[in-house]
Amino acid sequence: MIDGDGFRPNVGIVICNSHGQVFWAKRYGQHSWQFPQGGIDDGETPEQAMYRELYEEVGLTKNDVRILASSRHWLRYKLPKRLVRWDSKPVCIGQKQKWFLLRLECDESKVNMQRDRSPEFDGWRWVSYWYPVRQVVSFKRDVYRRALKEFAVIAMPFKERKFKRKGKKG
């Protein structure tokens, strides 16, 4: 399902723990890391898609997490031209994402990335809240920054909320 502007509806998932750290997952067979995410199927709400993706990619259920927030708006990123499949109809030029902030409510030992026949991830770790903004693939960086900025007031202790971009003074 691709919208009229060429963007595929998708959900992004930020899972936090009680220390303000976030769940950071290693892409299967690669050296890149990202938050769990996935497409919204026809007839599915963003929340339903989030729970489905959470189970498929991380092995957690609705009972293992609590929704703390969802993004107010769809956040978009364009794919680099080299990743666009120009021969597909309609052409998908990027993703528009509804983001969810979840708190892990169960023991982290319940994380199971091998539930699906084609796992998305083969490793994970807890990282500091702003770490993903500088580590994710460059074309997703602005969306990550915007989602984390929106969720910071909920996810982080007050003194750690501010994110400073490199090269800016103040």
Swiss-Prot record:
One of its GO terms (biological process) is mRNA catabolic process. SUPFAM superfamilies: Nudix. It comes from the Bacteria. One of its GO terms (molecular function) is mRNA 5'-diphosphatase activity. It is an enzyme of class 3 (hydrolase). Its cofactor is a divalent metal cation. Residues 6-149 form the Nudix hydrolase domain. Its EC number is 3.6.1.-. The keyword Cytoplasm does not apply. Keywords: Hydrolase. A motif (Nudix box) lies at residues 38-59. InterPro entries: Nudix_hydrolase (IPR020476), NUDIX_hydrolase-like_dom_sf (IPR015797), NUDIX_hydrolase_CS (IPR020084), NUDIX_hydrolase_dom (IPR000086), RppH (IPR022927). GO terms for cellular component: cytoplasm. Gene3D superfamilies: Nucleoside Triphosphate Pyrophosphohydrolase. Accelerates the degradation of transcripts by removing pyrophosphate from the 5'-end of triphosphorylated RNA, leading to a more labile monophosphorylated state that can stimulate subsequent ribonuclease cleavage. Belongs to the Nudix hydrolase family. RppH subfamily. This is RNA pyrophosphohydrolase. It comes from Aliivibrio fischeri (strain ATCC 700601 / ES114) (Vibrio fischeri).
